[in-house]
């Protein structure tokens, strides 16, 4: 895959528009940088003066730990990531005092996964 400046710009601007992204978001990476959202969201967060939090390895425990520590507002993840978060033990799931917005790509997550995530503010 070849990335180009025009594509990176369009991806960044499109994400700002489609996510109604505010200034200074706090974004938690759960996807590899070589994925479209992985590379594109680096530019998006820079555009919006955001904070980027990276995970070396994904696990629901690490996700929820870092999400709470850094007060994340946004994250991106494949449906399998969302399923892992929805299926995590209740004891590690925080109740966020704000909605954490997620962007996914590939096949849409099942409705049951989206419902489970919504219970915890995701």
Indicate where each model-derived feature is located:
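Conserved adenylation A10 loop of the ANL superfamily
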Residues: 1
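Conserved AMP-binding/adenylation subdomain of ANL enzymes
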Residues: 5, 9-26, 34-73, 88
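Hydrophobic alpha-helical segments typical of transmembrane helices
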Residues: 11, 29, 41, 62-63, ...
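Nucleotide donor/acceptor-binding cores
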Residues: 25, 31, 100
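Thr-Gly-centered strand-to-loop micro-motif
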Residues: 29-30, 54-55, 103-105
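Conserved proline-anchored active-site loop of SAM-dependent methyltransferases
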Residues: 32, 78
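Gly/Ser/Thr-rich phosphate-binding loop
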Residues: 47, 69-77, 86-122
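Alpha-helix capping/helix-boundary segments
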Residues: 59, 80-82, 109
